[in-house]
């Protein structure tokens, strides 16, 4: 298992609320919590930036982290990430923040300490551009947006 440096920025994290952890041995994501001063009501269409009380330092340029929505919040309540996916670079050291967007039709209360997103480590391959005049020909070519067939 990879070690991930973390700093607790909100003293309630690890005391009143558990530190992020994997729920099962097969879990891919660590749950991030809303470390708010008070519960907030997210109105339909509203987006709010929510602190997690945690900063991380990945340090390995071969890794990055992604902040992803929790499936239950999106499916049951219409609460998704305002930026859809948060990408955390390996050299970032600031607080993890979660942009929550209520795409539903009813107000939703986010409680202090509620699990609002998940953090997943992913491998990164950095590439450089090799400028060419033409690409090698392929069957697909430049076709996109449904070009490979329907269902």
Curated annotation (Swiss-Prot):
EC number: 3.6.1.23
Organism: Ectopseudomonas mendocina (strain ymp) (Pseudomonas mendocina)
Binding site for substrate: 70-72, 83, 87-89, 97
GO BP term, example: dUMP biosynthetic process
The protein's name in its UniProt record: Deoxyuridine 5'-triphosphate nucleotidohydrolase
Lineage summary: Bacteria, Pseudomonadati, Pseudomonadota, Gammaproteobacteria, Pseudomonadales
Enzyme's top EC category: hydrolase
Needed cofactors: Mg(2+)
SUPFAM superfamilies in the cross-refs: dUTPase-like (SSF51283)
Matching PANTHER family: DEOXYURIDINE 5'-TRIPHOSPHATE NUCLEOTIDOHYDROLASE
Superkingdom: Bacteria
Pathway noted in the entry: Pyrimidine metabolism; dUMP biosynthesis; dUMP from dCTP (dUTP route): step 2/2
GO MF: dUTP diphosphatase activity; magnesium ion binding
């Amino acid at each position: 298992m990879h070690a991930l440096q973390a700093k607790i920025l909100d003293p309630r994290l690890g005391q009143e609320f558990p530190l992020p952890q994997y729920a099962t041995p097969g879990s891919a994501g660590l749950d991030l919590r809303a470390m708010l001063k008070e519960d907030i009501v997210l109105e339909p269409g509203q987006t709010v930036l929510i602190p997690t009380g945690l900063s991380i330092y990945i340090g390995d340029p071969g890794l990055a982290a992604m902040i992803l929505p929790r499936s239950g919040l999106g499916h049951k309540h219409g609460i998704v990430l305002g930026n859809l996916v948060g990408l955390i670079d390996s050299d970032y050291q600031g607080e993890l923040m979660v942009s929550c967007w209520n795409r539903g039709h009813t107000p939703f209360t986010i409680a202090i300490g509620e699990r609002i997103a998940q953090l997943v480590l992913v491998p990164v391959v950095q590439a450089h551009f090799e400028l060419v005049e033409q690409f090698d020909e392929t069957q697909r070519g430049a076709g996109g947006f449904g070009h490979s067939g329907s269902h």
